[in-house]
Each structure stands twice: as structure tokens, then as C-alpha cells.
Amino acid sequence: MLKHIIDVLADPIDGTALIGNDDFTQLISESGHAYDVAPAGYVTLAGDNGLRYSGDDLSMITARETFLSHGHFAPFVEAVSTTIEDLFDDIGLPDDAQPVITEVGAGTGYYLSHVLDSVAGARGIGIDVSTHAAELLAVCHPRVGAVVADVWSR
């Protein structure tokens, strides 16, 4: 949900903070730039030039989701989750902290949602350039906010 991560999002044009309008159908920057929240729950944060790439198409996303649902990468995602848990323990992160975990190229949110399941209170930002991926990303976990953006541009 974007409401859970709005405090860490910024306008890609000028870096000012974003806030949601009353019904959270738009995110608006302090400087007045507005970004529509898609009905599926993600927001596209692109600068004046828009996005250079469209990312994976629906068939690619569907194939990836089918593959991942069979558990082929389960050992890997478990190792990533354990590593992040251990890292937070090593740095002494308080139990009541709400760390933000960001995954760039998050796709459908498979990895991010598993990590959030293992870190109580953590919030997730999933970023992908594909709107098809963002539709699944937006609903992969209640503490994930989905953003369509090109991380190589501001």
C-alpha cells in the first residue's frame, strides 16, 4: 500500500516530498506535480520525459509468476530473508523499528514479500518499470507500496 511508504517517496522531477490527496488517487508534491495512482494500487513516478522502457509484458510476468510459484527459488529467497534478518540483528535494530526495504526490479514482489514476512514491522518499496508487474506487486503484501519508475533516471 502506498499509504505505508508515502513518507519516503519523492517527486522524481525536483525531489520534494509527496503526499496523497484525500482519496489517495493522486500523489502530489510540495511543488505541485501530481502523479495518478492506478486503480491497481501502484503509482508511476516518471520525470518530464516519461519512461524510456516498458519492461516485461504480461506474458513474461505470467511465466515468471508461474515459475516462482513452483518453489524453484525457495532456497534462495529463504537465504536472502535470513541474511536480512541477521543484518538487522547485527546492527541492533530495535524490535519496534519499521525499516524500509526497497527492491529495485521487484517484478511481482516475490522476493520482497517473503523478506517482509520475516521482518516484523518492515515496510517495502517495490520498484519496477513494468506496469504489468506493478499490478501484482501492489497486492503481493499488505506492507508493500508499488512504484513504476526507471531507477536510472531521476
At which residue positions do the language-model features occur?
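N-terminal auxiliary segments of SAM/dcSAM-dependent transferases
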Residues: 1-55
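Class I SAM-dependent methyltransferase Rossmann-like catalytic core
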Residues: 53-79, 83, 87
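Conserved class I S-adenosyl-L-methionine
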Residues: 96-107
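Conserved SAM-binding loop of SAM-dependent methyltransferases across substrates and taxa
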Residues: 108-120
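Short beta-strand element of Class I
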Residues: 122-125
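Conserved SAM/SAH-binding beta-strand->alpha-helix loop
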Residues: 128-132
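Conserved SAM-binding loop
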Residues: 137-138
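Conserved SAM-binding strand-loop segment of SAM-dependent methyltransferases
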Residues: 142-153
